[in-house]
Amino acid sequence: MEKNTDKKKSSGWLRRFFFGGSRALADDVTNVEEIISPGRQIVRNFFERKLAVFAMIVVIAMFLFVFIAPLFMPKYRDTYTETTQQNLPPGFSMLSVPSELAENVKIIDSFGSFSVGVSNSGDLYVWGNTKIGTTGYDVADIPQEVQDANIVMAAAGIDHIIAIGDDGTIYGWGNDRLGQFGRKDEFAENNNIIEFPEELAENGVDVANVKKLTCGYQSTAILMNDGSVYVWGNKFAYSNMDAFINRGGFVDIDFTLNYVVGIQEAGNAVYTGTRGLYNQARADVTEKPIAMNEYLKGRKIVGLASGSSNICLILDDGSVCLVGDFQSGSVSVPKLADGERFVDIEAGTYHFTGLTNQGNVYSWGGDTLNQTAVPKGITSAVKIYAGAFQSYAVDQNGKLLGKWGLKGYLFGTDGNGADVFQRVVNGGRMTMTVGAVAVVISSIIGIIVGCLSGYFGGKVDLILMRVTEGFSSIPFLPFALTLSAVMSQMTLSENMRIFIIMCILGVLSWTGLARLVRGQVLSTRENEFVIAAQAMGVKSGKIAFKHILPNVISVILVTLTLDFATCLLTESSLSYLGFGVQFPRPTWGNMLNGANNATIIKNFWWQWLFPAAFLAVTTICINIVGDTLRDVMDPKSSADR
């Protein structure tokens, strides 16, 4: 019977707070114009403040954004890194093939963040992110002599471009500090540089006998029809370059990220100059690799296309096989129809694009950036090209039929080549989760301590307040840094570390709320309804938590809102200093930690601006909402100001 009465009382209190009292409570119904509950009045007053409403919308939108947006990023990984995409600015120009080239394509090539193209009329075009880091070079600044020449071949490396004119002249521009092109005395003295061949510098190359021009990471190779090879550039990037100098008999050559690779006339292995490297093959990414000679069974390798750490080989029967390592979740090699076979293969950093004798185009391999999403309707292609994360299909007239893959990055990339937008979204989720859990912990402790201390008073109040003062006397930031440093020496999982950080924030930030609740309870316990409850014999715990606490809930809500913003800033401060959530797991704080040097602040502004903006906007809006709640819930505080 008593439980039913309690339920009715609590439900009645909630009903009156949010929906107002019954008209039957009035002595004269005809004199009642409108009865508004306290809750409705608070809501009405809040929505009259346009700035507060805007701030609340921003906070809600931010919450929904950081918790829902990751659901649409199934390929996101905290540990993702990509050397060829480091420090790229915001933009979507990587697939922006110039309109003049799109109607008359002869060559398209790319190794990193920019692409180079040559038209059938001999004009050269460059697009994408063309500025080379902080070097000051911009490959879009095409030398005048190249613009005046009739270009027949071109290839792009990570930071340079090599082009060949119809007269055999070899042109190079971009970064040349590690022997990418040109001849300098300092190159000859550097053991880590293989200098541009003197005969090519003086006499050029016989264009009619050039079979392939290809560039890698700060290196270049030219394959001649007679099987000889010219190779030069950064030997530190490709330690096996010496194995290709003065060696002939090659039918194809290319660069992975770490090795020069080639196919010799025998066609029974991938040549690297190192025994045991790339000596296993498989038909698909899902299969287990076996020894190369066992896989070939007399078939011959006639061509290759190299990605970052893998190779696709074309066999003389029109089939393909894979060598090297592939990312998890890679797309499988397509199953061709009877009579269909591959006639050309091009490679990106992690994906491959193949053209069949029936004009069909397929892509497979790594698909983290949608490199394998071939548009429908490409059935009459005669030539394909691939960039680092892009692919192109061209018809017999040189007209671009389709392009697919990475367009660019909304917020640019960081120093590891990761998408800043995706890290901001996932970092916001982590920051808000840590802040919310910390506030819940501090609220539970603060409300219990404050309510007990304020209601019972005496020795209970004395003991609890001394404990509170003890916690408040702990210097928060040094203590948190010390605990984080201790944890870094312990074998803790990242999730456990994050949980401990939440607990640290919660356990050290409840003292202010406890004092506030204590003061409100001390004031409220002298009211008549409390005295009446005591006279009726209601238990002290029930009076404290069921009668007094609901009357101070408005102050608690305001404090929780403001404390949440404080916890966001505190977590971000710890992470910024390197003592919070650790890289590679992102938070807004540790993303700012990666942008704390002058080079990044000046040259790579997007790496700190976006996380800083999200953090600032969120905390400011939360504070605006909290201040407005305080004003509408406590009219006296507003009047005092």
Give the role of each language-model region.
Residues 114-117, 126, 160-163, 172, ...:
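Conserved core positions of repeat-based scaffolds
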Residues 485-487, 562, 570-610, 614, ...:
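Glycine-rich helix-loop "coupling/hinge" segments at transmembrane-helix boundaries
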Residues 54-58, 111-114, 119-122, 421-455, ...:
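Transmembrane alpha-helix signature in integral membrane proteins
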Residues 530, 624-641:
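Short cytosolic juxtamembrane segments of multi-pass membrane proteins
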Residues 441-446, 454-460, 464-515, 519-521, ...:
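Generic hydrophobic transmembrane alpha-helix motif, especially the helices
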Residues 97, 127-147, 174-201, 233-249, ...:
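Short glycine/serine- and acidic-residue-enriched loop/turn motifs that recur at repeat junctions
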Residues 418-433, 453, 457-465, 522, ...:
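Amphipathic cytosolic juxtamembrane alpha-helices at the membrane-cytosol interface
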Residues 429-445, 541-573, 622:
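Transmembrane alpha-helices
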